[in-house]
Amino acid sequence: LSEVPLRNGRRADLMGIDAKGLVVIVEIKVARADLLGDAKWPDYLDYCDRFYWGLPPGLDRAPLESAAYRPETCGVIVADGYDAEILRPAALDPLAAAR
């Protein structure tokens, strides 16, 4: 699903359920400035079991390796209009049962 409203007032770019029934959120960034200027993405973490950054091919992924972007937690997907590849799997951080 795209543009999914969350209870905290944020809106997830993409949200889905994987084959194991886990909730996955993908925050899409198409430009370096968009990626570097996003301070709201941690607000999504309480609403998913796995969180990914979705990027187009060619976008500099170096910022995602810094501690500010939690590389130990957040996965990276690179996609174009035809295909997608998980370059770094997201860590499992199970949702609280109340969510």
Residue spans of the language-model regions?
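Short, polar loop motifs at secondary-structure junctions
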Residues: 55-60
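Non-catalytic C-terminal interaction segments of nucleic acid-processing enzymes
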Residues: 64, 68-99
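Active-site beta-strand-loop-beta-strand hairpin of nuclease catalytic cores
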Residues: 8, 12-25
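Active-site-adjacent loop/helix micro-motif of nuclease/hydrolase catalytic cores
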Residues: 24-27, 32-43, 61-64
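A short acidic/basic microdomain associated with nuclease active sites
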Residues: 1-7
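Glycine-rich, phosphate-binding/catalytic loops in enzymes
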Residues: 41-45, 69-70
